[in-house]
């Protein structure tokens, strides 16, 4: 538990998830750019409280204000009132408890749930493990780290997350994803 003041106690996230990142400073009064990983950028503000990790320690940050500025979103964090204080927060990841995230419709998945899944081709070949996810604009892409003894000598595969076309079955209980994908790619 992190104590912020005599009146306020904030519970640390039990199931932490990164929802964004603090960017460069804006102005001299402690404002920062914020980069959101949520589907709609502004949705990041619906998930509170926010935490960051600095020097291996959790720190609660309280949002004072936010606004659009040109193509960016900028935020003011309570207690961060000058350029030096804001600079100390640049590149920190914004973390919340994943329990706050809404339930998804059938066939929709959070990236956090796909990372770590084994990817198996429809022919039964183990293509590797989902190591990361990427957004390309047209569709999400799984970054699959191949097994050490991959028969095709591949170290990493980029497999588009196209439901029905490439993705045949996702089983989060067994952490497996069945794909129609050539192991040679």
Swiss-Prot record:
Keywords: Chaperone, Cytoplasm, Ribosome biogenesis, rRNA processing. Its main location: cytoplasm. This is Ribosome maturation factor RimM. Belongs to the RimM family. Pfam families: PRC, RimM. GO terms for cellular component: cytoplasm; ribosome. The PRC barrel domain binds ribosomal protein uS19. GO terms for molecular function: ribosome binding. The lineage of its organism: Bacteria, Pseudomonadati, Pseudomonadota, Gammaproteobacteria, Enterobacterales. HAMAP family: Ribosome_mat_RimM. An accessory protein needed during the final step in the assembly of 30S ribosomal subunit, possibly for assembly of the head region. Essential for efficient processing of 16S rRNA. May be needed both before and after RbfA during the maturation of 16S rRNA. It has affinity for free ribosomal 30S subunits but not for 70S ribosomes.
């Amino acid at each position: 538990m992190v104590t912020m003041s005599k009146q306020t106690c904030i519970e640390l996230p039990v199931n932490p998830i990164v929802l964004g990142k603090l960017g460069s400073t804006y102005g001299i009064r402690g404002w920062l750019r914020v980069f959101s990983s949520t589907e709609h950028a502004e949705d990041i503000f619906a998930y509170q409280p926010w935490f960051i990790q600095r020097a291996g320690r959790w720190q609660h940050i309280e949002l004072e204000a936010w606004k659009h500025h040109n193509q960016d979103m900028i935020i003011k964090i309570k207690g961060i009132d000058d350029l030096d204080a804001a600079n100390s927060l640049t590149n920190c990841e914004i973390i919340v408890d994943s329990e706050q995230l809404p339930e998804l419709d059938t066939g929709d998945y959070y990236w956090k749930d796909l990372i770590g899944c084994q990817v198996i081709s429809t022919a039964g070949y183990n293509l590797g493990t989902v190591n990361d996810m990427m957004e390309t604009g047209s569709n999400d892409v799984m970054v699959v780290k191949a097994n050490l003894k991959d028969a095709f000598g591949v170290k990493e595969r980029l497999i588009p997350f196209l439901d029905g076309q490439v993705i045949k079955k996702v089983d989060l209980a067994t952490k497996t994803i069945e794909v129609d994908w050539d192991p040679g790619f």
